Amino acid sequence: VSTGPSESEGDLRASDGRIPGMRGLATRQKLLDASPTVLDTVAYRDLNVVDIARQAFTSPATFYQYFPDVESAMLALAGNLSEAWHADLRKLITNRDWDTDPDSAAHVVAEGMLEFWTRHKPVLRVLDLTSMEGDLRFREIRTFLLAGATDALMDLAAEREIPGDPMASAGVVVGMLA
């Protein structure tokens, strides 16, 4: 059972159909890691293969061994981010002392969400832009990413018997912090 968007073995295949070995996967990851750095200096629509390859100290031809275009690389990067952070955003909420110090718990959650958004701003900006433009692939990734926090807040609201709809309450809080 899939828990959300993630890269399947087919997504990791090189352009010639091979599944990369350890060195190939390291090169692929280096290209993914270079993308947010470049996005700090250019808009998503201006992001290009040459700039990513240069930042990764490799060639555009190497980029094309792993990704057909910039959009595919961004989908992979955003998918990886959502997989890694889905559970972490949930833990950010559930691993708090809401009984004896709810104000401090809320403060830590807000700070944690804002820190996450700041640290991953380039990729999250792309998720927001492409989602608003109607790209369902990016919207699905963004929704899955935020679902960890939303579900945890919904559970917390239901558990504490907060008046109103727990889903609405959770959605408002996540919307304000996202």
Q: Can you say where each PLM-predicted feature lies in the sequence?
A:
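Hydrophobic alpha-helical bundle segments that form small-molecule/ligand-binding pockets
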Residues: 94-99, 119, 124, 131-136, ...
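Generic hydrophobic, amphipathic alpha-helix propensity
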Residues: 23-35, 52, 77-89, 149
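Helix-turn-helix
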Residues: 30, 34, 38-72, 76
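Alpha-helical DNA-contacting segments of helix-turn-helix folds
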Residues: 39, 67, 73-81, 127, ...
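Hydrophobic alpha-helical connector segments
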Residues: 72, 76, 90-119, 166, ...
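N-terminal intrinsically disordered/low-complexity leader segments
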Residues: 1-26, 161
